Every structure is written in structure tokens, then in C-alpha cells.
Amino acid sequence: MLPALVALLAVLLPAGCRAADDTGAAPPPPGPLHWPVAAPPAIDPGRPVLWVALAAHVGPDAPGAQAPPLRLQAASGTLRLRDAAGRTADVPELLIDWRWQPLEQPLRLRRRVLGPFASFESAEQAAERWRAAGVAAVVARPRDWEVWAPVASADPAGWTGRVVEVVATGRPVPVWRSAKGPLTLQGPVTLEAASGLRWAQGVHGGPFRLQSDAHGRWTLVEQVPLERYLEGVVPHEIGAGSPQAALAAQAVLARTWALRNSHRFAVDGYHLCADTQCQVYSDPRQAGASVRRAIADTRLQVLTWDGRPIHAVYHASNGGVSAGFEEVWSGSPLPYLRPAIDGPDSLVARFPLPLTPPALVSLLADGRQAYGSDHGRFRWQRLLTADRLQQAIGADAGRTGRPTGLRVLERGPSGRVLALEIQGPSGVVVLRRDAIRRSLRELPSTLFTVEALASGRWRLDGGGFGHGAGLSQAGAITLASRGWTSRRILEHYYPGAALQVLGLNGQAP
């Protein structure tokens, strides 16, 4: 929710239909889409630094709303604070409360919105459709992923937008509990700590910024050099005990992914988040010798296609068959993310693609030759009930009634479900691609078959954990343990992509 939401008008109105039109009054002039925010700096290929949000949407979202104080503590010694008004302080700990500050003039925000989307990737595809038509569209995540554009923009083909208008009359401001009493800070607030900042049971090196976002709230951002960032990502994504070649492959992918996605939160003034909506980023100091070696051995190496970092997506387990990009997200196929059986030649020969329904059943029943078959969710089973399906479709249950059927409408070449139909006595709801797992979060993947049991119950037999595109971490661990190099592993999962050093030959993120 945006702060000081005193008006929410014209929600779910089609293009060309404004509340003001009904009275004959002239529509209001176009306003800003969101609170003004400076874009994060461009990344220097020679000395790449990422702005990573350690905490987003900080502070209350409305007058009278409660928000916990922000506690910032130096690992040892002191923190140096400087706010935009030039105030400075050196203290071992900062405790920041929030005060609601009225605006001198109300801020009217008006935008046309597509979404919500299940992922940034799907939202970005819709944004690209708008941009191709000359519309200045941005991707934002107030809660779920959305695409915002000027209110008069015509919807791109295949999507129906809604108009959102809010009038904000105030916003939260940070108030430092100083020894001399409460002191209102002017953002952005910069923080430095020679020993690092204690955060989320770890220590981060910084420097840091407390800055405003596109929603009228605040974000705690760490400005972290790319190679140090990897120390906080690699062990948490693949596991510090993985074989060295698997760690090195993960380091290249994490680096490539970060650069390719450095625009992900541009609307909020930073590059990346620190949770599963980006790459899980935690205390870099916890990286062991093997992780540091993998990062050092691949220093500044990225995978590219036509000189640009690729979509370096990866996941835990593909269940024995990799997904194509277009099977996971709405978008065109990518030449380096293709569906493929992930196993030795004998397994590839047994299961030619596209997989037929009987072949998929056979693969799920066996497939132990596949790389990464020792993963805990290489094979799985889930039971869905009518009550659970009704919960999953939310408001749509009002027009379908209690679910009575569950049917796969479409599969991709790898056998993954592209469209899942939930049937009711009054209608149907179709979940597509990444929206399937967004709605049914208990499903480890979209590689599954459906069997109806007794009335109102369905059994799903599936394989893999994650979206299935790109590198399978379980598969990479298997291949590394068999002596494959990191380069060979990357060539296997991203055929045709080139391994390049960032900053050489004009290479830029």
C-alpha cells in the first residue's frame, strides 16, 4: 500500500474510461507514476559495484500505522552517519524511529498497471511489449510484480490494464534517537562502519544508504563490490560443500545473473534485492576457502551472447530434463536455454523431445540415469484437494464455484505444464507457466502428471525443484564429481554462450 492513501480512484477501469469522463469534466493532467527516485548508478565494468537492498519498504505505509524501529549496529567500534543536510555522527548503534510528515502539497500519482505477475521475467516481457510501442513502461514490485506506464497508454496486445490513482498527503521520515533527543534525518543517509554492520545474524561490509523508494517508504541499501557480493551468494545458492567445479560454475552464473538483472529494482533506486526474488545474499564473511577460490578463479568472468550477459537462470533440480526459457516465462525462445534431457547419451536416446505423455510418465517413473538424480526432490508427489484449489484461485472461485476438475491443457517440449485448467460448475480458471507455482506454492516444479482420485482430490507425480531452465545445481554437482570442469558444465547447460571477462573488448553489463 502506498502511504497516505486518501484516494484510490478508477481501479480496474479500461483504457479510455475515466471516472471524470462520466461528469463531462476534463480529465486530470498526467501525473507522475510514482514517488520521485534517483536511478541507481550505472555499473562500471572495470570496478563493478552493486546496490543491494538489505531491507525494503521500511517505515509505516499510512498515518497512524505502526512500523518497527530500524536498529543499525556496528560489528565493533562505531558507525559514521551523514545525512543529506550535512549532519554527522559517530556512534556504536543507531536506533531509527519513524514520524509521519505531511506534504506541503498533495502528490497525485496516476498510472496504468498490468499485473500482478508471478515473476520479474514475466513482468519484463509485458514491459518490453509496451516499450516496443514507444511507451515508457517500468517494472515495480509494491507487493507482487507489476508494470506501470502513463495512464493514457494503450494496453499491449494480450494484456488488460487498470488505472490506479492515489493522492498522497504525507510520508514517513526517519527520526534518530540521539543522545540529545529525537533528530529528524534528511535522506539519503549514508553509513560507514570500518568493522561492518551487524545485519540478519551476519556482518556486511558496506558502505550503506538509507534512501527513499518509489512507494514513499525507505530502503536500506548496501553498496557492495561485485566479487564480494558473490561471497554472500554462492554458498547460499549451491552450498559451500559442493565440488570445486560446481562452485566455480555457480560463481560465473551468479555474476552474470547479477549484471543482466541490475535494472530489476531501478524504479526504487537500487539494483538488486537480497532474497529469492533475486539471488539469496547473506553475510559474505561466511564464505569458506573453497567458495573464495571459486570466485577468484573465475574473477570477472561472465557468460555472454552477442556480447551481452545472458539470462543466467539456474535452479535446484530439473528432474532429468531441462526446460526451455519459453516453457517457464512468457517470451520468445532463447538459443542457449533449450529443452534437453539432462543425462548421458543413452538416456537422451531413450527419451527424444518433445516428450509424449507416455514418455513423461516413463521418465518420472525411472530416470535415475539423469544427472542430479540424488537430489531430495528429484521425484516428488503432492495431493491437492478441491478446498486447496479454491484457495489457490482466490477471487476467481466466485465465478467458477467449488473446483470439480483439474486438467493439463498444454505441455512444452520438456513435458512441463504450460497451462493448467481448474474446472468448476460455473466456469474454469487457467493457470499458465510461472503462475502455476505462484498459485500452488506447494508444487516443487511444473514437471508433473495429474491423476484424479476420489471426488475432490488429485494426485500429482512430479520431478525436480525449481523452474528447470539453465543449470541444474544438482546436475552440476554430479558432473563436477565426475571430473567435469566448470567450463564444460556451463557449455552443457548454456550451449553456444561465450565465456568472457568483464571489461575486456568493450564488454559491459
Feature-to-residue mapping (PLM):
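Sec-dependent signal peptide recognition
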Residues: 1-7
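Conserved, single-site charged/polar hotspot
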Residues: 7-12, 16-509
